[in-house]
Regions:
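A short beta-sheet element
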Residues: 46-110, 117-120, 124-130, 240-241, ...
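A short glycine-rich beta-alpha junction/loop motif
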Residues: 4-7, 83-89, 120-143, 295-303, ...
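Hydrophobic pocket-lining residues within nucleotide cofactor-binding pockets
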Residues: 129, 182, 244, 249, ...
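Periplasmic-binding protein-like
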Residues: 325-329
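Short coil/turn segments at secondary-structure boundaries
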Residues: 37-42, 118-121, 190-195, 225-233, ...
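Amphipathic alpha-helical coiled-coil/heptad-repeat segments
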Residues: 1-12, 136-190, 352-412
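Sequence-specific dsDNA recognition surfaces
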Residues: 6-9, 22-61, 75-80, 84-87, ...
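Non-catalytic DNA-recognition/assembly elements of restriction-modification systems
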Residues: 2-46, 139, 143, 194-223, ...
Length: 412
């Protein structure tokens, strides 16, 4: 077992006694990105793993892209051919003492939270990257570590890709089940008719189509209010678009604003209400509310939907999920701009009027089926997380020398 010493750097920990450490600016050259000015076929990258457009300018590969800002800045990318990067990512070239692929693997395990700028959006400065300490084995050992990790990670990545694919298949299965049941019902084979609505297709011949607004009351939430109008106003918690998803309502701390007594009566969420997102990327998303310890209200990015009589709110929730996932909301809201699924648009959504008892049967059936599929998805996601953590821990062990390699195992 090799002798180890404390590196003096928190994220690195112990390193072999023959290794040293060095600041990144002595090992690599870090360059800013910029917006391209010409058209062409060169892929353009930001902080994400995929190019999002092409241009005429280029930088030569190989290079490593590291994030400047954004939720994925902690995920480095190795680019082997010509590329261009915009200002949400830095590109890195190696100096003579450092192997670029070894830097790529080090960047997987940097302590980003220690170096991040304290802003709303996660961000890293060029100076922070340049002043970061790196473990410095011999160039030969860097090659060996990078080559070993290439071989190991390619196998792990294959498992990760297969697991992600299985999760997507389960999600597709869930949507297929929802679509089939909310449009065809659960009472076996029966004559069908064309609904004349692209998003719905065929429905049972004896079942009419109506509009949501004829069967449900819809209340749009309150505009933001940053100050009380008089002494009767109180500061209350409210749901906003970020709180409402098909998976349910978020349990985190809620934002607050001022409500009058009349507004509290109008906008208070009740057990069993359907909350629907009015605007933004999640437009059309919805969830059924449950009782809370304290009253919670709605802001105007949310609508409360309640049955006028016999129509089932749980059935409507599944119908809306079906339509959202099939792209209906994108079309009626013109996704080219910021989508707004307004109260009028929700009221005009096609509503398949199954009998009261069949709506209940559909909701019960989908609750059971979706819960089973969701459990499988959760299990696969847990496995995915375990494998990702295993991969990261292996990378860390190798790049910091805690796990050794034979230096005869060299990269090409």
């Amino acid at each position: 077992m090799r002798e180890m010493k404390d590196s003096g750097v928190r994220w690195i920990g112990e390193i072999p006694t023959k290794w040293t450490i060095a600041k990144a600016k002595n090992c690599v050259e870090i360059q800013n990105g910029s917006d391209p000015k010409t058209e062409g076929s060169i892929p353009v990258y930001g902080s994400g793993s995929m190019s999002f457009k092409t241009c005429g300018e280029y930088k030569e590969g190989p290079s490593v892209l590291i994030g400047r800002k954004g939720a994925t800045l902690h995920i480095p990318h190795y680019i082997s051919s010509k590329f261009w990067n915009v200002d949400t990512a830095f590109n890195v070239y190696s100096k003579s003492i450092f192997d670029l692929k070894y830097y790529f693997y080090c960047a997987h395990v940097f302590d980003y939270t220690f170096y991040m700028s304290q802003t709303t959006l996660p961000s890293m400065t060029q100076t922070a990257y340049e002043n970061m300490f790196l473990p410095l084995p011999t160039k030969e050992e860097q090659y060996a570590i990078a080559n070993q990790l290439d071989q190991i990670c390619s196998k792990i990545d294959a498992v990760l890709e297969k697991t992600r694919a299985s999760i997507e298949e389960y999600k597709k299965l869930k949507q297929t089940v929802i679509t089939q049941v909310v449009t065809k019902g659960v009472r076996g084979d029966r004559p069908m008719k064309d609904s004349s609505i692209e998003w719905i297709g065929e429905i049972p011949a004896g079942v009419p189509i109506s509009r949501v607004g004829l069967h449900f009351d819809i209340v749009l939430g309150k505009m933001l209010c940053s100050a009380p109008v008089d002494d009767n106003y109180t500061l209350e918690s409210y749901y906003c678009a970020a709180d409402v998803h098909f998976e349910g309502l978020s349990n985190g701390e809620k934002k607050k604003m001022w409500f009058s007594p009349d507004e509290k009566e109008q906008y208070c969420v009740k057990n069993g209400d359907l909350l629907v997102v009015e605007g933004g990327a999640g437009a059309g998303g919805c969830a059924i509310a449950v009782s809370t310890d304290v009253p919670i209200y709605i802001q105007n990015s949310i609508m409360i939907v309640r049955s006028k009589g016999i129509s089932n709110i749980r059935y409507l929730r599944y119908l809306l999920e079906c339509l959202v996932k099939k792209g209906y909301i994108d079309v009626v809201c013109n996704k080219a701009t910021i989508p707004h699924f307004t109260k009028d648009k929700l009221a005009n959504v096609p509503f398949i009027v199954f009998s009261q008892s069949e709506q209940e049967e559909i909701a019960e059936y989908l609750n059971e089926k979706c819960a089973g599929i969701d459990a499988l998805i959760v299990k696969r996601q847990q496995y995915l997380t375990e494998i990702e953590n295993y991969k990261k821990s292996l990378i860390y062990e190798y790049v910091t020398g805690k796990k050794g390699v034979k230096t005869s195992v060299l990269a090409d």
